[in-house]
Swiss-Prot record:
<dbReference type="InterPro" id="IPR004405">
    <property type="entry name" value="Transl-rel_pelota"/>
</dbReference>
<dbReference type="InterPro" id="IPR005142">
    <property type="entry name" value="eRF1_3"/>
</dbReference>
<dbReference type="Pfam" id="PF03463">
    <property type="entry name" value="eRF1_1"/>
</dbReference>
<dbReference type="InterPro" id="IPR023521">
    <property type="entry name" value="Pelota_arc"/>
</dbReference>
<comment type="function">
    <text>May function in recognizing stalled ribosomes, interact with stem-loop structures in stalled mRNA molecules, and effect endonucleolytic cleavage of the mRNA. May play a role in the release non-functional ribosomes and degradation of damaged mRNAs. Has endoribonuclease activity.</text>
</comment>
<dbReference type="GO" id="GO:0005737">
    <property type="term" value="C:cytoplasm"/>
</dbReference>
<keyword id="KW-0255">Endonuclease</keyword>
<dbReference type="GO" id="GO:0032790">
    <property type="term" value="P:ribosome disassembly"/>
</dbReference>
<dbReference type="InterPro" id="IPR042226">
    <property type="entry name" value="eFR1_2_sf"/>
</dbReference>
<keyword id="KW-0963">Cytoplasm</keyword>
<dbReference type="GO" id="GO:0070651">
    <property type="term" value="P:nonfunctional rRNA decay"/>
</dbReference>
<protein>
    <recommendedName>
        <fullName>Protein pelota homolog</fullName>
        <ecNumber>3.1.-.-</ecNumber>
    </recommendedName>
</protein>
<comment type="similarity">
    <text>Belongs to the eukaryotic release factor 1 family. Pelota subfamily.</text>
</comment>
<dbReference type="Pfam" id="PF03465">
    <property type="entry name" value="eRF1_3"/>
</dbReference>
<dbReference type="InterPro" id="IPR029064">
    <property type="entry name" value="Ribosomal_eL30-like_sf"/>
</dbReference>
<dbReference type="GO" id="GO:0070481">
    <property type="term" value="P:nuclear-transcribed mRNA catabolic process, non-stop decay"/>
</dbReference>
<dbReference type="GO" id="GO:0004519">
    <property type="term" value="F:endonuclease activity"/>
</dbReference>
Length: 344
């Protein structure tokens, strides 16, 4: 999650959604009576026909829910403001919030609890180093909360200078990129460019950095204009989502190893996890997204458990359906905890 802006006077937070966990956090902090500003679509009658029209509205929140089988948060409420010509103020509406969307949340007063959850989620976001490369130039940058920092912007030697110059230039870019990776320790690298030179650089990077995930994409130029272009793409959100899924897979692998060697350090099932939480024993909990998908007593119980885990500095990992560990976890009741210490 990125906190794009917080207006203290209006008590308004503008957010960019980057992962399933972000949607879950919003599900927890949105309350009845809050207002949200977001883009949506609605069927509008045009004479004898109707058409789905895109628009930005202000919605007074009634309740929220996860929609089954999609990475989506549904926000139900009453339209407080919308373009006058559509005549839909006061109507019921549902905003579908997806990964990659932006939303403004306005509260009467943000509680310290809700603000802390937002800030904690923003601090969790993975770091990406972006390298735009072409035969004659390259640019390296890293996104931060406050904006994009250009780390390097240089020209490369001309292809006409000598034989083997492409490989030499690729090594030059990869070597400098590796230095920044060591300095900033990003979770992933995005290499983009207009031609095949990016693949040459990727080979060198993979030789130097064995354990960093490298994503490759195309962009029109290795310039600041190209950087602006890539930042508007869905690739950034995909990388964030992939990273969250990879973290879950590693934790599940750890849990399976413990089940085989030290089974007393793992517990699963709602009641068992709840008991472990009450004893302050939970280090990490993994749960499938289905458990937060509907308005029922089980979901409310799970939300209370997760709140207790956070208060006791435990880690929570929400596992989406596209995760490779989803069905494995579902077969273990859908909720599993790795423990800090043995309990009876």
């Amino acid at each position: 999650m990125r906190i794009l802006e917080f207006d203290e006077k209006r008590q308004a937070a503008k957010l960019h959604i980057e992962s399933e966990d972000d949607l879950w956090i919003l599900h927890l902090i949105l309350e009845k009576g809050d207002k949200v500003v977001a883009k949506t679509t609605r069927d509008i009658g045009l004479g004898k026909e109707s058409r789905r029209i895109p628009m930005t509205i202000v919605l007074k929140v009634d309740y929220t829910e996860f929609q089954e089988f999609t990475n989506r948060l549904r926000i139900h409420g009453i339209i407080e403001d919308a373009p006058e010509r559509f005549g839909i103020r006061g109507a019921h509406h549902t905003i579908n919030l997806d990964i990659g969307d932006e939303i403004i949340i306005i509260k009467q007063q943000w509680s310290k609890y809700a603000l802390d959850k937002l800030k904690k989620q923003a601090d969790k976001r993975s770091k990406i180093i972006i390298a735009l490369v072409d035969f004659d130039e390259y640019l390296i940058a890293i996104p931060f909360e406050q904006g994009i920092k250009i780390l390097s912007e240089k020209s490369l030697r001309s292809l006409n200078e000598e034989e083997g110059i492409i490989e030499q230039n690729a090594l030059e870019v990869a070597t400098e990129l590796a230095e920044y990776v060591k300095q900033y320790n990003p979770d992933a690298i995005l290499l983009a460019g207009p031609g095949f030179f990016k693949e040459e650089v990727a080979k060198k990077v993979n030789n130097i950095l064995k354990n960093k995930k490298v994503y490759i994409d195309s962009v029109s130029s290795a310039t600041r204009a190209g950087l602006h272009e890539i930042l508007k793409r869905d690739i950034i959100d995909k990388i964030m989502s992939d990273y969250e899924i990879a973290i879950g897979a590693k934790k599940m692998e750890k849990a399976m190893e413990l089940l085989a060697k030290q089974p007393e350090l793992v517990t699963y099932g709602l009641e068992q996890v709840k008991n472990a939480v009450e004893m302050g024993a939970v280090e990490t909990v993994l749960l499938i997204e289905d458990l937060l998908s509907s308005n029922n007593q089980e979901r409310l119980a799970i939300e209370r458990i997760l709140g207790d885990i956070e208060n006791k500095r435990g880690e929570i990992i929400l596992v989406p359906k596209e995760s490779p560990i989803y069905f494995e976890l579902k077969n273990l009741t859908g909720i599993l905890a790795i423990l800090r210490f043995r309990i009876n």
